[in-house]
Amino acid sequence: MTITSWLAASRHTVVLTGAGMSTESGLPDFRSPRTGLWARFNPSELATIDALYHRRESFVEFYQYRIRTLQQCQPHDGHRLLADWERRGIVQTIVTQNVDGFHQEAGSRRVIELHGSLRTVHCQRCGESKPSFVYLHGVLTCECGGVLRPSVVLFGEPLPEKAITEAWEAAQQADLFLVLGSSLQVSPANQLPLVAKRNGAKLVIINWEPTELDDLADAVIHQRKIGEVLNELNEQLAEVDP
């Protein structure tokens, strides 16, 4: 059996996407020293509640940079193919560690965002939400007087309970679980493939570098761009089910 045949036969495919999915769109990642965001900022210090209140200027500069960078990038072929696979009933759920909103922009509808979204900001006091571009125009406080912050999970904050529950349920239902561009170092996302495997799912990992779960996977692909691999799989799917 091949990845293509598993995709064709699957009744419930769940996809987990990580930073590698976003970097192919040109977005810098958090975890690459001297590249990505570490070249200009220290995310472990600035992406925190403490920085929001006590290093406000640096916090705002950091997230203005991230929002501006996001506006300059767009979904790639991999995002668009996953959306197409959802429309065709090949993919049922996408769980993402990314905050860029590219899956939704590409057309995916069933997306679970574990770490929130950089597409909106919200008030720490009243919870009112606004499009994140207002941050670029210096709108940093809410009408109620509360502090506005990006709607992402900051270091030290709990992940949204609803997203975790939905992701866990999706993993339990999966008969095929694809990992795309995740190093599987961050919990609880790195537990989802294990949940799927325990429930009998096939596990496929496509990531540039090896992961700690590679030995448990039914298929592993390294050193390949995700968009290219998905394009190849899509072409093979057309041959399996023309």
From Swiss-Prot:
Belongs to the sirtuin family. Class U subfamily. Zn(2+) binds at residues 123, 126, 142, 144. This is NAD-dependent protein deacetylase 1. PANTHER family: NAD-DEPENDENT PROTEIN DEACYLASE SIRTUIN-5, MITOCHONDRIAL-RELATED (PTHR11085:SF10). NAD(+) binds at residues 19, 23, 30-31, 97, 99-100, 115, 182-183, 207, 226. NAD-dependent protein deacetylase which modulates the activities of several enzymes which are inactive in their acetylated form. Signal peptide: none annotated. It is found in: Cytoplasm. The gene is cobB1. The active site is at residue 115. Binds 1 zinc ion per subunit.
